[in-house]
Amino acid sequence: MNIQASDLKQVITDAFNFEVVKLPLSAPDNQPTGYYGLFRDDLTGTDAVVGSSSVTSRYVPHTNDDVVALVEAASNVFDGDVDVKCHFNNGHYVSVKPTADHRINIYGDKDNIFPSIVISAGFDGRAFQATMGYYRDLCQNLAMMRQVSGTCQTIRHTRSLRPKMNDLIATFNQLEDGWNNLTNVIEHLETREVDLSQFLMAVYGSPEEDSKRSVTIHQNRIEAIFKRVRNERFYSGRPRMTNMVVSAWEAYNAVQGYAQHDSTRRGNATDFDRMLSASRDGFVKRAEELVLTA
């Protein structure tokens, strides 16, 4: 759903209809410890706990208004309406995408991408991060190639971001250069050929031959990735794969897509959870390194 800039605050506050508050922690004898915990104010018990560690009295958790300020600043990168998706998992995560007019064709008119800014605002004491990624229609991958110059910006967490909107907007506008760099890289990757079998060997290595489970997991993963590539070649109008040769762009997306959509995740992982997990996946990082340095 496309959202006008004037409606962003309502969308964010509806999605995050709670605040994270800092409360003092007590010892078993009810004596103060000098430490504090972070809790959602809409839940009780262990469900309310945010994060896995305590904080000091000096720590100030960010607010929903800070998240709104970040999203509003991000939306300024794109002209017109945006599409916003929100997620909370020990922190606020928001993706901001423009309308379909921003799509860029990579191969024909079926394999195309458009920009997506992913905002990460955790409660771990680290700076907020904004990353310019891409959404690929063909496989529904939302990927972030952080090794590409200009695609990541950090925002220092201060007591209030609202008075610093001009600085925020300037910071997010730098991601436009990152998008230009990213599209140039992607267009180059589409022109480069790689042997998919050798590429996957470089990413995953060989299984432990004396471990039947390791061999089975490896074989199933490779088969799933080859199936993913064959399907994507068919739906994008590419010719059938011969001699294991594909573009470096296809090879990277095959690894990233497997991590995002096919690999096993614990619990009831949402689409946003799976995207975040894939962005941290060591094999995806290795695949990115290989296609960018070859």
Indicate where each model-derived feature is located:
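A short acidic/basic microdomain associated with nuclease active sites
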Residues: 76-102
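Generic structural hydrophobic/aromatic packing signal, biased to beta-strands
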Residues: 38, 96-98, 119
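A near-ubiquitous, low-amplitude feature marking generic local secondary-structure context
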Residues: 33-34, 50-54, 79, 151, ...
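A generic structural signal for beta-strand entry/edge sites
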Residues: 35-36, 46, 91-93, 127
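Hydrophobic, Leu/Ile/Phe/Ala-enriched alpha-helical segments that form helix-helix packing faces
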Residues: 66-79
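Residues at beta-strand starts and edge strands
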Residues: 65, 90-92, 113
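Intrinsically disordered, low-complexity regions enriched in serine/threonine
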Residues: 1-26, 30, 86-88, 101-294
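Feature for intrinsically disordered/low-complexity regulatory segments and propeptides
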Residues: 1-69
